[in-house]
C-alpha cells in the first residue's frame, strides 16, 4: 500500500493538530484502516491466491524501513509470523528459538517487532542482546531506531530525547523544565500522556538484564556467544 505523500510531511501528532479539520477528516478512514490492519492483519490476493498475513507481519512489510528499502513478501516469513502469534497467545510459551540461514531477515523482523510492540505498550521495557555489545548496539542504532523514525505520525508515540538515540529509545513525555518565570506567573503546563516505555541494549554477559522485567527480549546471534559468557546462564537470569 503506497504511503500518501500528503501525510509524509506530518512528523508528529502536534503537526497533525495544526492542520484544518477538512484536511484531517479526509484521512480519518485511512488512519483507522491502518490501525485495524495492525490489530487484525490483512487479506490480499498473492498472484491470485487468497493470502492472510498477521498484523505484526503487516507492520513489517508496510511500515518498517530496512537496508534495502521496503521488505519483500516471503511465504516463509508469513508462516514465521503466524507461529509467532501462536507463541504470544500461549501462556505456557516463553518465546521462540529460531534457527535460520543467512540473510533471512530475522534481525530486521525482530527489530520491527520490538518497535511494533513498544509503541503500543505502556510501562514496559524491551531489550536487545547479541553476540557482543557492539553488535547489540549496531542492531539498535541501524535497525530499531530507523524503523521507529520512519513510522507514520499516527503510530508514533511521544518520544523523549534525540530522534536517533544511541543507547535508549524512550517513548515518554519529556521532562518539563520549571523556571522561575513559570512558577511566578503560575503558567499552566499542557498535560500529555506518554507510554513510559523504553527499548535499549546491553553488553553481552551472563547477567545482562539481571533483575529487570522485560516484556520482550530480542536475542540476536545467540548461538555465537564467546566464552566465558554462556547464553544458558543468561537464559536462567
Please provide the spans of the model-predicted regions.
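Phosphate/NTP-binding elements of NTP-utilizing enzymes
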Residues: 1-237
Amino acid at each position: 500500500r503506497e504511503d500518501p505523500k500528503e501525510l509524509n510531511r506530518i512528523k508528529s501528532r502536534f503537526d497533525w493538530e495544526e492542520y484544518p479539520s477538512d484536511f484531517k477528516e479526509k484521512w480519518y478512514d485511512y488512519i483507522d484502516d491502518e490501525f485495524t490492519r495492525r490489530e487484525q492483519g490483512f487479506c490480499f490476493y498473492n498472484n491470485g491466491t487468497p493470502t492472510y498475513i498477521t498484523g505484526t507481519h503487516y507492520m513489517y512489510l508496510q511500515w518498517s524501513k530496512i537496508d534495502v528499502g521496503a521488505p519483500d513478501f516471503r511465504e516463509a516469513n508469513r508462516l514465521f509470523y503466524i507461529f509467532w502469534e501462536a507463541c504470544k497467545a500461549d501462556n505456557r510459551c516463553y518465546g521462540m528459538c529460531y534457527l535460520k540461514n543467512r540473510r533471512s531477515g530475522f534481525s530486521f523482523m525482530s527489530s520491527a517487532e520490538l518497535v511494533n510492540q513498544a509503541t503500543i505498550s505502556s510501562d514496559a521495557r524491551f531489550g536487545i542482546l547479541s553476540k557482543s555489545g557492539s553488535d547489540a548496539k549496531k542492531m539498535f542504532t541501524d535497525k530499531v531506531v530507523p524503523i521507529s523514525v520512519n513510522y507514520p505520525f499516527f503510530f508514533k508515540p511521544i518520544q523523549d530525547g534525540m530522534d536517533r538515540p544511541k543507547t535508549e529509545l524512550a517513548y515518554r513525555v519529556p521532562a518539563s523544565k520549571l523556571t522561575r518565570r513559570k512558577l511566578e506567573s503560575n503558567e499552566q503546563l499542557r498535560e500529555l500522556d506518554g507510554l513510559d516505555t523504553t527499548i535499549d541494549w546491553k553488553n553481552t554477559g551472563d547477567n545482562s538484564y539481571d533483575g529487570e522485567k522485560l516484556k520482550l527480549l530480542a536475542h540476536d546471534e545467540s548461538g555465537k556467544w564467546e566464552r566465558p559468557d554462556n547464553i544458558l546462564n543468561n537464559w536462567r537470569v
